[in-house]
Amino acid sequence: TYADLKLPCSSVVKKAFEELDVKVQAAYKEGYEGMASLDQELLFQWTGRMVYGLLYYEMLYERDRLLRQGEDFELSADLRERFGRFHLMLQSLIEPISFIGKKPWTIAVFPLKYSADIFSYRDDAINLMFSFGVNGFGFIACLQDNGVIGEKQKEILDKMEGHVLHPIQFEELYARFHYSDYILQYKPKYKIETQDHGIVVEAETAGKQPLFGFWDEDIFAQL
């Protein structure tokens, strides 16, 4: 179960995440208003911790599976770069790392109408995506898209503002984010500099613009 998942970490990291959990728990008790008031960097760190943990276990599972078959486990250069940047950004929890300009993520928080016994959770660790919904609120996070998917879905996000989502609407919205990520032909790039006060991460917006492939309604309907 998820409760059994544990990751190796230093005492400094453990303490930092415990302090983060206290902040999120306090916001959680206030429902949508509390979660929506949280700084998005805190939500990035909180969701990122879970996605990173799942990614860690997925990599261990795949490594062990291949070793049993006498094969080597290797990540592609693109995945090594993606996960390396993600790990660097997560260290903003304990290190002086700041994000300037456009944020590396898209995070949408909204009121959600679920019955008290329903809990919705989805993740795509490889693509660094996450969704979470309970009675009162839900949120969807794309943790390394440079805000591109949020811009793609801006029209529908604007229409949602001020409305409480039905569970089916929540599932459809996550499907929209997930499919947008699938057809996105874009590799996020960053300017990362070490300065006197710490590390600065800036999303590069010049150069090749994001391009989305053909939106196939039949495939979208299956998500």
PLM region descriptions:
Residues 1-29:
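An N-terminal structural lobe/cap that precedes and organizes the functional/catalytic core
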Residues 11-13, 48-55, 133-135, 142-144:
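Structured loops at beta-to-helix junctions and adjacent beta-edge loops in soluble globular domains
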Residues 16-19, 47-82:
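Short flanking/linker segments adjacent to small metal-binding domains or redox-active Cys/His motifs
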Residues 26-27, 32, 68, 139:
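Domain-level detector of nuclease and nuclease-like folds
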Residues 28, 65, 148-150:
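Generic alpha-helical propensity signal that fires on short helical segments
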Residues 29-45:
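Short microdomains enriched in Cys/His and/or Lys/Arg
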Residues 41-53, 61-65, 84-93, 195-197:
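Short, Lys/Arg-enriched charge-dense amphipathic segments
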Residues 70-223:
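C-terminal, charged low-complexity interaction regions
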